[in-house]
């Protein structure tokens, strides 16, 4: 263990790999709400958070399990699900009066085209203003799950048994993975129609 008068013990959350305090300070100095995106092994979580003197206050918070409400049959931790989550959290934030935010991905590596940036794209499409570079946004094909559908179609022809095993959860839910892009567009349309109606009512009040 390092010792000596110049050695500084890191904050506990930094030691445990939970918080990057330098990045957090920069986000807080913006004085804007934060779109906080986190991943688990099974789900993706998105929150819009405002910093207050007494601590962070969550304006809206949701995870990909909420997609079932709109009939989502795909996995809850892939790129299409991440986008749909961002779409929902963006609309919910706007309904609560939030117009802009800054992205907070915590300790996740900022890899262009990754799921955290799919959440960002969904929130942008819902109308939230969030500073970003276009190069980090996943392609439309990845967002719709076309890459998954193409892989599934190829696997189905080459190895039907492995196809059934690898996509067993899709098939159990009644979704052929080759149809994922079409299913994605159907669920996206439902989300937009639902929240555009709620947003119109919120603005009219």
UniProtKB/Swiss-Prot annotation:
Self-association and partners: Part of the 50S ribosomal subunit. Contacts the 5S and 23S rRNAs.
MF term (GO), any: 5S rRNA binding
CC terms in the record's Gene Ontology section: cytosolic large ribosomal subunit
A Pfam family recorded for this sequence: Ribosomal_L5e
Biological processes, Gene Ontology terms: ribosomal large subunit assembly; translation
Keyword Nucleotide-binding: no
Role: This is one of the proteins that bind and probably mediate the attachment of the 5S RNA into the large ribosomal subunit, where it forms part of the central protuberance.
Keywords per UniProt: Ribonucleoprotein, Ribosomal protein, RNA-binding, rRNA-binding
Record protein name field: Large ribosomal subunit protein uL18
Entry similarity comment: Belongs to the universal ribosomal protein uL18 family.
């Amino acid at each position: 263990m390092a010792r000596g008068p110049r050695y500084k013990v890191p904050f506990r959350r930094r030691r445990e790999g939970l918080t990057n305090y330098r990045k957090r300070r920069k986000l807080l100095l913006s004085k804007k709400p934060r779109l906080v995106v986190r991943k688990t092994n099974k789900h993706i979580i998105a929150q819009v958070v405002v910093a207050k003197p007494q601590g962070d206050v969550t304006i809206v918070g949701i995870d990909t399990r909420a997609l079932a409400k709109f009939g989502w049959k795909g996995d809850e931790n892939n790129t299409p699900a991440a986008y749909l989550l961002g779409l929902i959290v963006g609309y919910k934030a706007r309904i609560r009066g939030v117009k802009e935010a800054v992205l907070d991905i915590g300790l996740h590596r900022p890899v262009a085209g990754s799921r955290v940036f799919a959440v960002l794209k969904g929130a942008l499409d819902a109308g939230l203003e969030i500073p970003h570079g276009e190069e980090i946004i996943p392609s439309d094909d990845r967002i719709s799950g076309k890459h998954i559908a193409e892989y599934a179609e190829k696997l189905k022809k080459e190895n039907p048994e492995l196809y059934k095993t690898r996509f067993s959860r899709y098939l159990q839910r009644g979704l052929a993975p080759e149809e994922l892009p079409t299913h994605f567009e159907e669920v996206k349309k439902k989300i937009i129609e639902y929240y555009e109606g709620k947003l119109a009512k919120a603005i009219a009040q």
